[in-house]
Curated annotation (Swiss-Prot):
Keywords: Allergen, Phosphoprotein, Ribonucleoprotein, Ribosomal protein. It comes from the Eukaryota. Residues 85-110 are annotated as: Disordered. Transmembrane segments: none annotated. Belongs to the eukaryotic ribosomal protein P1/P2 family. One of its GO terms (cellular component) is cytosolic large ribosomal subunit. The lineage of its organism: Eukaryota, Fungi, Dikarya, Ascomycota, Pezizomycotina. It comes from Davidiella tassiana (Mycosphaerella tassiana). Pfam families: Ribosomal_60s (PF00428). This is Large ribosomal subunit protein P1. GO terms for biological process: cytoplasmic translation; translational elongation. P1 and P2 exist as dimers at the large ribosomal subunit. InterPro entries: P1/P2_N_sf, Ribosomal_P1/P2.
Amino acid sequence: MSAAELASSYAALILADEGLEITADKLQALISAAKVPEIEPIWTSLFAKALEGKDVKDLLLNVGSGGGAAPAAGGAAAGGAAAVLDAPAEEKAEEEKEESDDDMGFGLFD
């Protein structure tokens, strides 16, 4: 990541943290105040357009919401909820057993 991208990213995060609208002018003002040398205005306008109308805090909170986040959330759940979260994993294991390739006499080298 280049210095321009980093500076624009950090400036956008600062604006989002303060609850301000992310615009190219505000990004450029923050970057200038930080005395980052020679950032082309294209970077600030790209970041402003990319983040226009989006809640940056919400984006950051949902970064890990892919497939791996559910088990981590299940560990923090209270008593009865933990048992409910573990049930689908057990069903999945049973399905895999049913779909196993038992020797049916159709071997390649029989």
